[in-house]
Amino acid sequence: MSDQQLDPQALQQEENTLIALRKEKLAAGRAKGQAFPNDFRRDSYCNDLQKQYVDKTKEELAEAAIPVKVAGRIMLNRGSFMVIQDMTGRIQVYVNRKTLAEETLAEVKTWDLGDIIAAEGTLARSGKGDLYVEMTTVRLLTKSLRPLPDKHHGLTDTEQRYRQRYVDLIVNEDVRETFRVRSQVIAHIRSFLMKRDFLEVETPMLQTIPGGAAAKPFETHHNALDMEMFLRIAPELYLKRLVVGGFEKVFEINRNFRNEGVSTRHNPEFTMLEFYQAYADYEDNMDLTEELFRELAQLVLGTTDVPYGDKVFHFGEPFVRLSVFDSILKYNPDLTAADLQDVDKARAIAKKAGAKVLGFEGLGKLQVMIFEELVEHKLKQPHFITQYPFEVSPLARRNDENPSVTDRFELFIGGREIANAYSELNDAEDQAERFQAQVADKDAGDDEAMHYDADFVRALEYGMPPTAGEGIGIDRLVMLLTDSPSIRDVILFPHMRPQA
């Protein structure tokens, strides 16, 4: 009977039997005083050895007799040799019955896949050309009590992979590589900005007033202060306070929290880069963003052509720049400018498109609803969508030529928003009026409308220089660069419902 034909109860019973056997082996080790030693220090990593000695022949290695100390998890056990895995990769270790003590050979026979061992010996090469360690000593460091997934079928259940990411990382090299890339991306972003004189800062995660984005926050209670607080939805207002204070180039890479839906593109807890630079505008940020994205693609992929699913996104070409208004007309030739400029017609179009129209929305809000329903998913190649209506941009500076829109863009790639940026509103009186309008929208039923932040208005009253700011979703960016279909694939421990 195949594994697929076994019912879950039988599989669980088999696993329980294996766990019991492993616990017996651990008990025997404890009795000998040999359980979980912590006095071994390796001097080499598996993949480093593979790279360093790739050109050495069997004869050259035999003559050199290079001593090494390695450690790792047993991933394959063929009796005469084992394959161990560490954080860099894998290497074979040879069980030499001529050089290992009888007691050691007896212990090796009791070891299981998943056990973590330490090996000392010399490097050698097999007749097939594989590099290996000819062991002179080897011992068990950690007994694995749970069996690894079957090597033929692996860990294929998606939900189990997310719930037990530790197992996923052990058995799936491509998953480990995804998170190495994520680390690379964040490190390069940090370096990219610091080379341009940006200062990295940290701002509050717990806030008394959630601001900086249109989103529903998580609420909590501060017992000592006896007050309601919120997990931040964005760091924006604190970062702009720092610009007021004289830190003219700042950035933060950290978590945001939004009490909203979960999907392949959304996780309630996510990582965001936000940066602000004085004496710049949103067009400067477009140029900076293009440069950053090209560097990241080149770093990760070695090319500016980014494959994703059945598409290839071209980061090496200038990103398309198109206004919200013009993009609606471009991708919906049946609509006219007159349709979008009439509030009743725009409301009807938004409703027909499937938008949740509450009835109090102004023309600008309706235009954005139409854009989100009819255009957003069509923006496959990189697009900077600009000139968002001021009604939906309460923190952005109005456009000098058309005050009904703002100097703002959102970057879309693959039909997904990747970044949001604008020339910052630094007119304290205008900001106060927009906060008041947001409060009115919230009172009318808009859960995502912003609160009034009097302290932020006060900060602006001291004077903030002309500034441009931007937020980039790290998770979605990593999805693009690793060709990952779900945001859960690029978050180590995504949120899941508790198991029954």
Curated annotation (Swiss-Prot):
Q: Which positions are annotated as binding Mg(2+) 2? A: E417
PROSITE patterns cross-referenced by the UniProt entry: AA_TRNA_LIGASE_II (PS50862)
The biological process GO terms on file are: lysyl-tRNA aminoacylation
Family assignment? Belongs to the class-II aminoacyl-tRNA synthetase family.
Protein's recorded name: Lysine--tRNA ligase
The catalytic activity of this protein is classed by the Enzyme Commission as 6.1.1.6
Can you name one GO molecular function term for this protein?
ATP binding
**Top class in the EC scheme:** ligase
Q: State its cofactor.
A: Mg(2+)
What the record notes about the co-factor is: Binds 3 Mg(2+) ions per subunit.
Question: Where is this chain's protein located in or outside the cell?
Answer: Cytoplasm
Entry keyword Nucleotide-binding:
yes
Question: Which GO cellular component terms are attached?
Answer: cytosol
Q: Does the keyword DNA repair apply?
A: no
Q: Which residues take part in binding Mg(2+) 1? A: E410, E417
Q: Which CDD domains match?
A: LysRS_core, LysRS_N
Where does the UniProt annotation place the signal sequence? none
How this chain assembles, per its entry, is: Homodimer.
Q: What reaction does this enzyme carry out catalytically?
A: tRNA(Lys) + L-lysine + ATP = L-lysyl-tRNA(Lys) + AMP + diphosphate
Q: What is its main location?
A: cytoplasm
